[in-house]
Amino acid sequence: MKPMPDQTDILPATADPIPAELLELLSEPRLVVEPGVAARVAAVAGPVLHGMGYRLVRIKVSGELGCTVQIMAERPDGTMLIEDCEAISKALSPVLDVADPIDKAYRLEVSSPGIDRPLVRRSDFERYAGYLVKIDMAVPHQGRKRFRGILGGIEGDAVHLQREGVRGDDDPAVLLTIEDISDARLVLTDELIAESMRRGKIAEREMKQNLGILPPPPPHAKKSDPTKSNAPKPKAAKAKSKVAKTPPKNTKEHRLAAERLRRGDIDPPEGD
């Protein structure tokens, strides 16, 4: 493997400066990271993505059918389009060739994190609070290494989780220390798919507006916040009305009675 060059010498030049409001999100460190060869790739890819306005999510090096390096990336708001993946691949390929973090031939794949994405930053655990997740621990918590349940956000340096399928007297609520987590990811649900589609449409619309393909929205239009979580909320119980409902007056029974009354068969019922 070649010596790692200075990152400042191999970063691609960006066309536009990164807006100040995005710098904080771009600079947020990952709390769940990969070891070994993937860590060497991350040391090269991370600064490149940051300079382009993207965040590194996860790197996976697979040896099946040859060596494949998969790089997951995203915009600061969590969205990712095909055009973003193409731009990253084009900029990152020559940088990896120079840095050479892998000592054999490999195939580079750049992708979005996916709908059932890994959670690697503090903001990820906060953004997807209310959704179903599964978490694997590097260090067991109360004798367990695998957990599944509804994410409750961050409490200090730990993740709050409301576990599913708890039996007996076990407390469903647990706090899992973030630095002890080896893998955390969302579980595919209908609510998660709907939320992902919403964010994707917003990102695509903004890209078309920036390219001049789509006219800008009117000044009075309400702007959606793609960083806001739209997790499903508990349904409130409907209060029962105490007002007595008026019984119907035009049922089949009433019509038959009216016909018999017209023929003089019976007297009209009281109140009709």
UniProtKB/Swiss-Prot annotation:
Q: Which GO terms describe its biological process?
A: ribosomal small subunit assembly; translation
What's one Pfam family here? Answer: DUF150_C
Instruction: Show the GO cellular component annotation of the record.
Output: cytosol
Q: Which UniProt keywords apply?
A: Cytoplasm, Ribosome biogenesis
Q: Where is this region: Disordered?
A: 209-272
Basic and acidic residues composition-biased segments: 250-266
Task: List locations, semicolon-separated.
Answer: Cytoplasm
What is the documented function of this protein? Required for maturation of 30S ribosomal subunits.
Task: Look up keyword Cytoplasm and say if it applies.
Answer: yes
CDD domains attached here? YlxS_C (cd01734)
Q: This chain belongs to which protein, by name? A: Ribosome maturation factor RimP
